[in-house]
Amino acid sequence: TIPIEAAMIGLNMAPGINRSFVSGNWRWITKNVWDKAREEAGSLIINDAELNVQGYDIDESALKVARINAKLAGLENKLHFQKRDIKELSSKDHYGFIVTNPPYGERLSDQKSVEGLYKEMGKVFSKLDTWSFYIITSHEEFERFFGRRADKKRKLYNGMMRTDLYQFFGPKPPKRNNYESAELSEIEK
């Protein structure tokens, strides 16, 4: 769901725009009010926004579910999903960010493999030194295995399970003025 939510934010798409709610059947709010609200939310979507949202997983069944959910959200043409091991992650982009919810290793038998995954993430992500990373996990020693202390850490709950959002901030990309943007647009043609 992270790539789907990222695309919705990038397109300025209201959450739940494609869903129905019990409140839509309340007698004291007419159907017209809900229709008008949906129409207004739809008019605010930026359909031509340039997005580069990608989702990776080593589990093909997880990717299949993600593709189905992207289609249900009307975003199948805005997202790219691919089966890929974390070891293969790279990018030519100088700036970007990664939001990930890796396995937590809640079962004792998974603990060692998850800790190995966190070490591998630390190695791979360190090569993307101008990127920012946002990692959600319940593992209390995540930073030790990742090899770096987070710039910020926020407590979250995934249902009843306490997790933490570890935030690692990269540098901000340089600002481009309108002249540079126009120049780049000409070069890209």
What are these regions (language model features)?
Residues 183-185:
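Cys/His Zn-binding finger modules involved in RNA regulation
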